[in-house]
Amino acid sequence: MTDGRTERAKAAREQRELQILEAALQVFAARGYHGTSVSDLVDAAGVARGTFYLYFDSKQAVFLALLERLLVAMRGAVLGVDTRAGAAPLTDQVVAILRAFLTTAAGSRALTTIVFREAVVLDQAVQERVREHEGAFLAWISGSLRNGVALGLLRPHDPDLAAVLIYGAVRHVLERCLDDHTTAADIDRLARGMVDHHLHGLLPPVTA
């Protein structure tokens, strides 16, 4: 068993780490990734440089920690579709999933903006982590589409190609959600519009 002092020390360490991360997020948002130095992070967090290095060994390590928090939250927003009898209509479920994903990303607007708009100039380790996330997301979309075909919910198609097209659309829709004036109603409209476009296309419905 751990004693009270150990628990308090652990809590204090977690609080200090969170303090550094929250301060770093504001600095990255204001200066961008490459415009930020360790000195900027130390000053913003209000800690000694030695204290900073007890938690993170570089600016990159801080950004990767922030990135991981964002990716975990985004993955948590993406749920599977319920195909049981009595479940909500497929379209409504997909809209809810996309809306939750966009809302989560927009809720971390500063970090999401850096990741998606500065991705090509970020450090290699950061780029690799973003690519891993993109690869996992593409695989999830493709797998979901395959399941949809197998269950008769979707027509036969190339799920890998469709996944690339859907992910590209998600990224561009996400860009729209990063505007400071984007509201929950805007996100809902974007989610519904994108789902309608991908599931139903632009042609009028075929009538018998």
Region roles according to the model:
Residues F56, F63-L70:
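Alpha-helical DNA-contacting segments of helix-turn-helix folds
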Residues M1-G4, R99-T103, G107, A139, ...:
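C-terminal peripheral helix-coil segments that are non-catalytic and often amphipathic
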Residues M1-R31, T36-V47, A61:
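Basic, helix-initiating cap at the start of DNA-binding domains
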Residues A65, L79-A110, A162-I166, D188-A191:
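Hydrophobic alpha-helical connector segments
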Residues G46-F56:
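Short hydrophobic/aromatic patch on the recognition helix
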Residues F56, R117-L122:
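Short helix-capping/turn signature of helix-turn-helix
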Residues Q60-V62, D179:
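A secondary-structure capping/hinge motif
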Residues V72-L79, T104, Q124-A150, D160-V164, ...:
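Amphipathic alpha-helical packing segments from all-alpha helical-bundle domains
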